[in-house]
Swiss-Prot record:
UniProt-annotated stretches for the region Disordered: 1-28
Job description of the protein: Catalyzes the hydrolysis of inorganic orthophosphate from phytate.
Gene Ontology MF term list: 3-phytase activity
Family matches, as PROSITE patterns: HIS_ACID_PHOSPHAT_1
Coiled coil location: none
Catalyses which reaction(s): 1D-myo-inositol hexakisphosphate + H2O = 1D-myo-inositol 1,2,4,5,6-pentakisphosphate + phosphate
UniProt keyword terms in alphabetical order: Hydrolase
InterPro entries: Acid_Pase_AS, His_PPase_superfam
Protein name: 3-phytase B
EC id: 3.1.3.8
Active-site feature positions: 17
Sequence similarity: Belongs to the histidine acid phosphatase family.
Length: 28
């Protein structure tokens, strides 16, 4: 398996989580 694909998958998951659960430091 390509390590790059794993990294991309993690980034996508993080982005999704950020959208669903925005960090308190986001501003709102």
């Amino acid at each position: 398996r390509d390590p790059t694909g794993c990294e991309v998958d993690q980034v996508i998951m993080v982005k999704r989580h950020g959208e669903r659960y925005p960090s308190p430091s986001a501003g709102k």
